[in-house]
């Protein structure tokens, strides 16, 4: 398909144009990147979209008072809601399909309440002063793409070089066997959901900066593509195989 479009319109294959298009899918990729950790353990995170929506509202409203520290608030909020999903899933034995759907409903309600059920807008000057670098370019490379590569590198390090990554792989391959070997499965599963929530929050922050505002439904339509990016990349819903590099390939596809 790319070859056909490129033949019809040679300008389509210009490096600058391809990089620009890659930059546009960064929020989707970041959301899918976080979801990979949950799918990796055989779960699913249906709250990511609503989480991103909430963060666009929070970032827009509190940018004026918190400045750059609003980013920390957004990530902490995403981590907390993800932790809540993981806690309900592991400690209360609620299937992740239901627990994350409930957390997504909570995030949506919070976004509706904070925004007054309407779209909110950032002050353009303040946005450019605090987060303008996020939507700028380094040469012909969009800075969002650089952020995505950095996050991919961190996720890859966690997956392949840390105890957390190795345990998540073991849990996905066989939860009962992992528990029998003495691993605190619940603790690590909660962390997987917390990571997913944190990255959904970063995706929401990028959304807010790119669009200079937020709304309770601004990221609607991204949940299914994020899940598909994970699955197409080769991380099945049963977990245990695949990984974040696969998700990067799946997102590009």
Question: Can you name each region flagged by the protein language model?
Answer:
Residues 66-104:
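Alpha-helical transmembrane segments within multi-pass membrane transporters and channels
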Residues 4-67, 88-93, 232-244:
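Single transmembrane alpha-helix segments in multi-pass membrane proteins
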Residues 92, 96-161, 188-191, 210-219:
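Transmembrane helix-bundle core of multi-pass membrane transporters
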Residues 200, 210-253:
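Transmembrane alpha-helical segments in multi-pass inner-membrane proteins
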Residues 1-6, 35, 104-112, 147-157, ...:
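Hydrophobic core segments of alpha-helical transmembrane domains in multi-pass membrane transport
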Residues 21, 29, 50-51, 68-76, ...:
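Hydrophobic alpha-helical transmembrane segments
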Residues 1-13, 41, 112-115, 119, ...:
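Structural signal for alpha-helical transmembrane segments and their membrane-water exit/capping regions
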Residues 67-74, 81-85, 138-214:
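Helix-loop-helix "hairpin" substructures at the membrane interface of multi-pass membrane proteins
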């Amino acid at each position: 398909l790319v070859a056909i479009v490129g033949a019809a319109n040679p300008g389509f294959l210009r490096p600058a144009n391809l990089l620009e298009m890659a930059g546009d899918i960064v929020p989707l990729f970041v959301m899918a990147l976080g979801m990979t950790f949950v799918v990796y353990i055989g779960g699913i995170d249906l709250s990511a979209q609503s989480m991103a929506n909430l963060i666009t509202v929070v970032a827009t409203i509190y940018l004026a008072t918190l400045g750059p520290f609003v980013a920390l608030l957004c990530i902490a909020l995403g981590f907390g809601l993800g932790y809540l999903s993981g806690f309900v899933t592991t400690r209360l034995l609620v299937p992740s399909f239901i627990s994350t759907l409930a957390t997504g409903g909570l995030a949506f309600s919070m976004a509706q309440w904070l925004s007054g059920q309407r779209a909110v807008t950032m002050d353009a000057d303040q946005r450019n002063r605090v987060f303008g670098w996020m939507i700028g370019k380094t040469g012909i490379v969009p800075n969002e793409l650089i952020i995505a590569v950095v996050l991919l590198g961190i996720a890859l390090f966690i997956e392949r070089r840390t105890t957390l990554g190795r345990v998540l792989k073991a849990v996905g391959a066989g939860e009962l066997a992992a528990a029998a070997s003495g691993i605190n499965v619940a603790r690590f599963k909660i962390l997987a959901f917390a990571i997913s929530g944190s990255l959904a929050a970063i995706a929401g922050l990028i959304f807010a900066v790119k669009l200079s505002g937020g709304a309770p439904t601004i990221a609607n339509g991204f949940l299914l593509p994020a899940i598909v990016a994970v699955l197409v990349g080769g991380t099945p819903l049963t977990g245990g195989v695949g990984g974040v590099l696969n998700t990067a390939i799946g997102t590009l596809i």
